[in-house]
């Protein structure tokens, strides 16, 4: 049985992890976040999604948690921005040129408010509900004075092969991590969820060994490697399961919520911790 007594912070991925099969936050989650906060355990959403999208998901409890967004490029602690890593325009130009060599790749770049689709919108329709807010169709990269905080590539086929090819070509600039069914997350080298979480830990004075983390995809790899209590989803990628200390149920079974409930109950605060607002 898992020992929860030393946990001081919980970091959780969103898609394929905390969200249900309809890409929604199960309602019980909000009471669990309140209960964790009441027990002195900080909850952190750690996702490839942008901060504005994450905050909307957690609006009822957003002021009682922290956010590592855009795969570590946006870090918010106690409601304040503590770090933002902007992509180099020159590096993006190299990536865009490479993506254009492959018919099965379609690139999206994001600033704080918009999603810039650098291909025919029809290429993205299959997962158009996957964090593409305020879409703007462009035929080239936005201007260099646009602060790009996130980059994703939609892949029609051979996702793992394409991630390998992109890495071979541009490994000095980026890290490429397969995510979801057909996406490849593009991260600046040296920037990932783990680097973002490290900033949150420093702000709260928490050690990595006192962190529980949940994830399912390769963009969760570094953080699961780092923490004391790593939990891979039953629906997660094989490599993520291999390096995690535990494998729990699937997101469709609300397995994360069950684990959060167990943490709350381990603090002997029972149902009294579950506030309602």
Enumerate the language-model features and the residues they cover.
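Mg2+-dependent phosphoryl-transfer enzymes with acidic/Ser/Thr/Gly-rich catalytic loops
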Residues: 2-9, 26, 186-277
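Short active-site oxyanion
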Residues: 38-44, 63-65, 149-150, 209-210, ...
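Active-site phosphate-binding/coordination module
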Residues: 22-124
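Alpha-helical scaffold elements within enzyme catalytic domains, especially in hydrolases
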Residues: 35, 97-98, 166-168, 239
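Conserved acidic, metal-coordinating active-site core of Asp-based
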Residues: 103-214, 218-226, 235
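Asp-based phosphoryl-transfer active-site loop
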Residues: 6-22
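Hydrophobic packing residues within well-ordered alpha-helices of enzyme cores
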Residues: 29, 54-58, 163, 240, ...
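Short, structured coil segments at secondary-structure junctions
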Residues: 60-63, 71, 169-172, 226-227, ...
């Amino acid at each position: 049985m898992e020992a929860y007594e030393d946990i001081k912070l919980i970091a959780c991925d969103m898609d394929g992890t905390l969200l249900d099969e309809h890409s929604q936050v199960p309602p019980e989650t909000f009471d669990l976040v309140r209960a964790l906060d009441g027990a002195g355990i900080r909850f952190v959403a750690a996702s490839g999604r942008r901060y504005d999208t994450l905050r909307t998901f957690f609006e009822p409890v957003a002021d009682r948690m922290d956010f590592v967004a855009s795969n570590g490029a946006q870090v918010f602690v106690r409601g304040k921005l503590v770090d933002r890593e902007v992509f180099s325009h020159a590096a993006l130009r190299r990536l865009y040129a490479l993506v254009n060599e492959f018919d099965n790749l379609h690139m999206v770049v994001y600033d704080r408010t918009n999603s810039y689709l650098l291909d025919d919108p029809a290429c993205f329709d299959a997962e158009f509900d996957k964090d593409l807010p305020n879409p703007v169709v462009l035929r080239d990269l936005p201007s260099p004075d646009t602060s790009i905080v996130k980059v994703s590539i939609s892949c029609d086929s051979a996702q793992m092969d394409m991630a390998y090819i992109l890495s071979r070509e541009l490994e000095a600039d980026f890290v490429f991590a397969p995510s979801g069914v057909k996406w490849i997350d593009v991260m600046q080298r040296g920037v990932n969820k783990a680097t973002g979480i490290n900033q949150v830990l420093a702000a709260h004075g928490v050690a990595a060994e006192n962190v529980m983390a949940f994830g399912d995809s390769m963009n969760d790899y570094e953080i699961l490697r780092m923490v004391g209590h790593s939990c891979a989803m039953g629906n997660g990628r094989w490599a993520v399961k291999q390096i995690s200390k535990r494998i729990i149920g699937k997101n469709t079974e609300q397995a994360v919520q069950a684990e959060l409930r167990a943490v709350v109950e381990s603090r002997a605060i029972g149902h009294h911790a579950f506030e309602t607002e």
